[in-house]
Amino acid sequence: MNRVVITGYGVTSPIGNEPETFLESLKTGKNGIGPISKFDVSETGVTLAAEVKDFSMEKYFVKKDGKRMDKFSLFGIYAALEAMAMSGLDTSQLDVDRFGVMVGSGIGGLETIQNQVIRMHDKGPERVAPLFIPMAIGNMVAGNIALRVGAKGICTSTVTACASATHSIGEAFRNIKHGYSDVIIAGGAEAPITEIGISGFASLTALTKATDPEKASIPFDKERSGFVMGEGAGVFILESLDHALERGATILGEVVGYGANCDAYHMTSPTPDGSGAAKAMVLAMEEAGISPEKIGYINAHGTSTQANDSAESKAIELALGDAAKTAYVSSTKSMTGHLLGAAGGIEGIATLNALQHQFIPPTINVENQDEAITVNVVLNESKEHKFDYALSNSLGFGGHNAVICLKRWED
């Protein structure tokens, strides 16, 4: 079996598109949530989202790329190329048949779908764009990344709603662990902040209608009222340890465990007792070969909905037992909003940053922690902490649970 290490990462997020900016935002508790600027929100009752700011198209794209790819693909490619640059990978020195891409998306090209349905309605079916399908389908983020970097190995795009990125990272970990690939770009990308996206989740009563960005995404708070939609991408460069050492790569961390299962309970609600998510955490720790006492931090799914935060708190206590009293928990969605299928990508990166720099990112804007949530939540300010192992949880509609276990790298 191969050990699997992280040698690079890239982010496109509401709190920064460069590694240094993203890290500083995590440490200082920057709020990436604000008024929706993309369209008129007056009829939806939802006014806030976590939009990507200062996205530099010019860095990696030409003008026509914006007309040939949906924004979720652009976000994913940007993050992948940033990760490649950090890792120092030279594709001319790789066996490209063992170089893969596993980048998921929960919804895919939602903006493209919306625009083309309107176009067909207004102008007729013959006016639908020829590239509508390849712009809209969710797998194209992985396909477009592979095209851009020349990766000819495994290329998949997992669709498991809000667990998509974490499933992609976990499956990439297993693929390398069992010897099928040397290097895989793994994570998720999403661009759901559209009229139809906001309206759909609002109709489901999943989104908060709070109008104050400081009181909107408040995981574990007694007054939480729904999640704030976000957008962006987060990807890792995963690599076998032997391959990384052979090329002299800088190793940032190690993936040591992965757990995945299904609640088989409800279309959109988690198992109230948290048993499904708990089992996924246990599976990740078992593969890592560690006891719950070793876990120093859990980056919770923590959506700021009543159902999720209550169930996940119970899940952590079920999975860790007495160790849940000492493991620190936070939800970085309080800063980034909920990136749906990309959430596990940027949250995995946040977890890696926490391990590298030995701190716990805060859950910001929490004024009154729900007394029924008794896990050890780090509130409002980051906390210095020495630890070696962490979990990153992602729980999706459909009952999908995915958890990765990361280990701090010691030279």
What are these regions (language model features)?
Residues 1-6, 91-95, 288-294, 325, ...:
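Flexible, low-complexity linker/loop segments at domain and module junctions
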Residues 3-7, 30, 34, 212-288, ...:
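Condensing-enzyme catalytic core mediating Claisen C-C bond formation in acyl metabolism
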Residues 6, 22, 27-161, 189-198, ...:
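Conserved beta-ketoacyl condensing-enzyme motif
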Residues 20-27, 111-125, 175-178, 198-211, ...:
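A glycine- and small-aliphatic-rich helix-loop capping segment at beta-alpha/alpha-beta transitions
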Residues 41-51, 108-112, 191-217, 259-279, ...:
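Active-site-adjacent elements of ketosynthase-type condensing enzymes
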Residues 76-89, 138-142, 146-190, 228-249, ...:
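Active-site-proximal alpha-helical scaffold in enzymes
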Residues 122-129, 167-170, 174, 190-246, ...:
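Glycine-/small-residue-rich "gating" segment that lines the acyl/pantetheine channel
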Residues 128-133, 153-160, 221-225, 327-338, ...:
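Short pre-catalytic strand/loop immediately N-terminal to key active-site residues, enriched for Gly-Thr
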